[in-house]
Regions:
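Enzymes that bind and transform nitrogen-containing heteroaromatic metabolites
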Residues: 1-180
């Protein structure tokens, strides 16, 4: 059975977005980027909400991103190689290949996907992840904690659940980012 993993960048105070909804508070860091690329490459299927999907679709729709460096080319290859399931009630059609749309996050369907997938699944985006956490579907969490206090919005982790977790890994990057 495949694992369903959740990965997210977050500020020290637990937010994924700044107060205006932006992500650019996490400046480029090559070592962190390599680690995230390896994590992305370890999954065969990504589960996204519409907003996260639209943010990341550029890794397939904008060839200039992949051409910037070997690091970005590797990330683009990993992203494009994976199947994507996008949960959206408003998106009319996929923006990328290897992508299917689902109107609702159905717990039984995701359980079935975990049971039949040949590779692990990676859920991206805190809102969709909160649904997976609430259903008891998340097997592992990978957080990249940036040394910044945002006072932002959109918490990286559900605020209405208590879960006992086991620390499997920790790594501190030279930039101060900590991967848990």
């Amino acid at each position: 059975m495949a694992k369903l993993n959740y990965a997210s960048n977050m500020s020290l105070d637990g937010w994924t977005e700044d107060s205006s909804g932006g992500f650019n508070w996490a400046p480029p860091d090559d070592d962190v980027f390599v680690s995230i690329t390896e994590l992305m490459g370890s999954a065969g299927t990504y589960l996204y909400g519409r907003r996260m999907y639209e943010t990341l679709a550029v890794w397939e729709t904008d060839a200039s991103l992949a051409n910037r460096s070997d690091l970005t080319a590797n990330y683009a290859r990993a992203w494009q190689a994976a199947d994507k399931v996008v949960y959206s009630s408003t998106l009319a059609e996929p923006l990328t290949t290897k992508t299917r749309l689902e109107r609702d996050f159905d717990v039984d369907t995701v359980r079935g996907l975990k049971a039949t997938a040949s590779g692990d699944l990676l859920v991206g985006g805190p809102n969709l992840a909160a649904q997976a956490f609430a259903a008891g579907l998340v097997d592992e969490v990978a957080l990249f904690v940036w040394p910044i206090i945002l006072g932002g919005r959109n918490p990286a982790l559900p605020t209405d659940l208590q879960l006992d977790l086991e620390l499997l890994h920790e790594h501190r990057f030279e930039s101060g980012v900590v991967n848990l």
